UniProtKB/Swiss-Prot annotation:
Highest taxon listed in the record's lineage: Bacteria
Subcellular location(s) per record: Cytoplasm
Record protein name field: Elongation factor P
Gene: efp
Entries under SUPFAM superfamilies matching the protein: Nucleic acid-binding proteins, Translation proteins SH3-like domain
Length: 189
């Protein structure tokens, strides 16, 4: 599907130079005093991980990759693969572990429903839920009289991840974590 360079957003996947590229940063729109406006894109190759910077005229058209989305349930890890089950056909598939960012892998909990985006039947990207509920395994003791302030303390979660939490939380409590930037949201209800 052709898309105008002006309409490209961060996270879009493009077909460019016979490869798939993800736009890894917000496009930089520039209109110099002399000459036409252009768009500067930082793109990352989905296969090799190499980054390139390309400049396109704002009137250029690029090929946006058409991705298919299906819901799967995460079952378990096996060596360098994740085992997922299709929620409609109950077929199991293996997906490379490298398809997901290493800092988000600990938050992929068993039986979590995720979306797998495929291009020509090849998995390209996993879309995790926006938030997950995890338990605080270890943190410094509760501070009496602590209220919601700007000061945070480190905590180790049940999945092994480290995160900063407010001082009024203690070990054993469940919290909601936003996966976009791996940050504390609130106590789990």
């Amino acid at each position: 599907m052709k898309i105008l360079a002006n309409a490209i957003r961060e996270g879009n996947i493009l077909e460019y130079q016979n490869n798939l590229w993800i736009v890894s940063k917000k496009p930089d729109h520039t209109k110099p005093g002399k000459g036409g406006a252009y768009i500067q894109l930082e793109m990352k190759n989905l296969k090799t991980g190499t980054k390139i910077y390309e400049r396109f005229s704002s009137s250029d058209y690029l090929e946006k990759a058409t991705l298919e989305q299906r819901n799967y349930q995460y079952l378990y890890q096996e060596n360098n693969h994740l085992v997922l089950m299709d929620l409609e056909s109950f077929e199991q598939i293996l997906v490379q572990k490298s398809i997901i960012a290493s800092n988000k892998l600990p938050f992929l909990l068993e039986n979590t429903v995720i979306t797998v985006e495929t291009y020509k039947d090849e998995p390209i990207r996993l879309v995790l839920p926006h938030t997950v509920v995890v338990e605080i395994l270890e943190t410094s003791p509760n501070i009496k009289g602590a209220t919601v302030t700007a000061s945070y303390k480190p905590a180790i979660l049940s999945n092994g991840a480290k995160i900063m939490v407010p001082p009024y939380l203690s070990a054993g409590e469940k919290i909601v974590v936003k996966l976009e930037d791996i940050s504390f949201v609130e106590r789990a209800k």
